[in-house]
Every structure is written in C-alpha cells, then in structure tokens.
C-alpha cells in the first residue's frame, strides 16, 4: 500500500544488515525489534548512517535493543525500563512542530512505556508522560 505513495522498504530479521554495504542503498532505517546484541561494527555502520543525515526511526520496543551498547541508548534517546498498558491521551508539547501538523487530540489504548537514561537534548517532539 505504501509503494503507491513512493515509500518502498525491505524487511530484515537479523542485525547483519547493519553494514555500510547494505545501508548505502537506503534513505532510512526503521527499527521495530527486540534484538539483544549489536557488534561494534554494526553500531558504527548504523551511527555513521544516521550522522551522515539518513533517517533512523526506532519504534515501539526498539529502545529495549542492544542494552550492552551505551552509544545506542544515546542514539535512541533513552533505554526501555518497563511498561504497563492503559488508556491515555498523548500530550503534544510542541504543537507548532511540523510533524504534528493536523494532529488532533485523541485517546488510545497501548503499552505505556517507561524509559531510563533519557537524553534531553534534541527532543523537539518528546512527550514525557507522568509516571
């Protein structure tokens, strides 16, 4: 369905895709996984990819990945600590940010993630939830 909008993607299940040879073919990496380990070479490839201006979108449980690699925690902006579930209303702290254009207030049910090691820098759209 997304291909009709010009969005194409490949799906990988192993971290060996995190190499310069593979990443050079992509504009962005979306990480929706719960991998335990990343090699130093794989992290360097991902970090270089991001630092050179490519996109990185760690979603859902991605902040639980690679717990042994503190530089990954810095790149993501925090580390998964725990979660519960519940109904909540997201609060947009920066409603004038372009990513929120057209987003209306809503209520949803989901896992309510709690993070540690929060990187407060460059969090233009960060929504801190009351504990």
Where are these regions (language model features)?
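Aromatic-Pro/Gly-enriched surface loop or interdomain linker
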Residues: 1-26
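An acidic, glycine-rich "communication" segment
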Residues: 59-131
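A generic local structural motif
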Residues: 15-18, 43-44, 111-113
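Conserved beta-strand scaffold positions in the cores of enzyme catalytic domains, especially
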Residues: 9-11, 56, 124-126
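Structured segments of extracytoplasmic/periplasmic soluble domains
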Residues: 1-8, 32, 49-52, 75
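Short alpha-beta junction capping motif
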Residues: 23-67
